[in-house]
Regions:
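Glycine- and aromatic-enriched membrane alpha-helices
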Residues: 1-421
Length: 421
């Protein structure tokens, strides 16, 4: 075995270990969403997380991977190869099947973000339809623009991004591609569904509908925090050599600092704003920090990471309140704010706080401009496709369960079983 073989083997093991950590985020999402919703819908919300991963695994393998990483002439969409990966060779020599698994768990993460925002009133059959479309089309196409060699990430001389901004769009681990796509789809889906029964009074004021188990939600957030150490550092896709081990260590640090700063910022903001520190908001604040740092965790300094996480934690509190009380969009778990708003925020802050090229480090506005255009195009794509999908389903066959089913719980009526007996 040569040194090169040993290096590729080590990199492969690291990539697959990171994929396992990201897969473990699925039970984190499931527990978090279940804890923030009512007990009568627990089996339904847990089931939807399994559905996302089952559909995602098969459809991304069969078609989505080709759309995302297949070759094309315009940089918009790759060519599907229907389960045949002979077309693809990883630049660093990593096994294609291992790389497929790594990308599959990211696709499933984006899909599962939506389930919490649409909780407690969505037809299970129609949620399955959504899950098919995000894994098959919505996520892979925007992913192609950035991670698949498409137009947004093209840093070659003469490319549109380099001629316009002097920089390509940068999203290291998915603040935009994974989280803002999921968050925007969650927001559009919640609008299409309408609020839960009893959420808003006749006067239009929002009424709290507490979740049933903060213990489950807190365990879910701990699992997500842990899984993020595969999500972000794993996106380096290599562990051998000094450059990679330094990069992984740096990303571990920036990821953790942003999470801690986000949680503390939300805790203090809720304490000042509402008179008491909110545990449920703080849990989401931790996730807000993690989401926000994901785009630039490789480029910002530790201080920059803490600043991004802290600001995301503050923004989260006001975003959740604004979406709930002003826009009257009922998002039971705050996914639109955590993943959508904070994903956008983190992507933009990368252009400001990147040590190399960031506006605040003397790099001008080129990098920031590239980030602005990138997040705009990605989220417009998610919003338009999501609107066509959700409002199309609503018009044709109905997206929401009947009033009686919603009142008595989806577990019994949709699945014939209850999570608690």
């Amino acid at each position: 075995m040569t040194i090169q073989d040993l290096s590729i083997s080590l990199d492969t093991v690291w990539m697959l270990l990171a994929a396992m950590l990201v897969f473990f985020m699925q039970p984190g999402f499931a527990l978090c969403e279940a804890g923030f919703t009512r007990s009568k819908n627990t089996a339904n919300i847990l089931f939807k997380n399994f559905v996302d991963f089952m559909f995602g695994s098969l459809l991304f393998w069969l078609i989505g991977f080709g759309f995302m990483f297949g070759s094309d002439g315009q940089g918009f969409i790759g060519m599907p190869h229907f389960g045949d990966f002979s077309f693809y060779t990883h630049p660093a020599g990593l096994p294609t099947e291992g790389f497929l698994i790594f990308q599959t768990v990211f696709c499933a993460t984006s899909a599962t973000i939506v389930s919490g925002a649409m909780a407690e009133r969505t037809k299970f059959s129609m949620y399955c339809v959504y899950s098919v479309f995000i894994s098959l089309l919505i996520y892979p196409i925007s992913g192609h623009w950035t991670w698949g060699g498409g137009w947004l990430c093209n840093g070659e001389a003469g490319s549109f991004m380099m001629d316009t901004f002097g920089y390509a769009f940068h999203d290291f681990a998915g603040s935009a591609i994974v989280h803002s796509v999921g968050g925007v789809l969650a927001f559009v889906g919640a609008i299409a569904l309408g609020p839960r029964l009893g959420k808003y009074g006749k006067d239009g004021k929002s009424r709290a509908i507490p979740g049933h188990n903060l213990m489950a939600a807190s365990l879910g957030v701990f699992i997500l925090w842990f899984g993020w150490f595969g999500f972000n550092p794993g996106s380096q896709l290599a562990a051998s050599g000094e450059v990679n081990r330094v990069a992984i260590s740096h990303v571990f640090l920036t990821t953790n600092l942003a999470a801690a700063a986000g949680g503390l910022a939300t805790m203090f903001t809720s304490w000042i704003k509402y008179g008491k520190p909110s545990f449920s908001l703080t849990l989401n604040g931790i996730l807000a920090g993690l989401v926000a740092i994901t785009a630039g965790c490789d480029l910002v300094s530790p201080l920059g990471a803490a600043i991004i996480g802290f600001l995301a934690g503050i923004i989260l509190v006001f975003s959740i309140e604004f979406i709930d009380t002003k826009l009257h969009v009922d998002d039971p778990v705050g996914a639109s704010s955590v993943h959508g708003v904070c994903g956008i925020f983190g992507t933009l802050m990368t252009g400001l706080l990147a040590v190399d090229g960031g506006t605040f480090y003397g790099g001008g506005f080129g990098f920031f401009g590239a980030q602005c255009l990138g997040i705009l195009c990605i989220d417009v794509w998610a919003a338009v496709t999501g609107a066509i999908l959700f409002f199309g389903i609503k018009k044709l066959v109905g997206l929401r369960v009947d009033k009686r089913i919603e009142e008595e719980g989806l577990d019994i009526y949709e699945h014939g079983e209850s999570c608690y007996n």
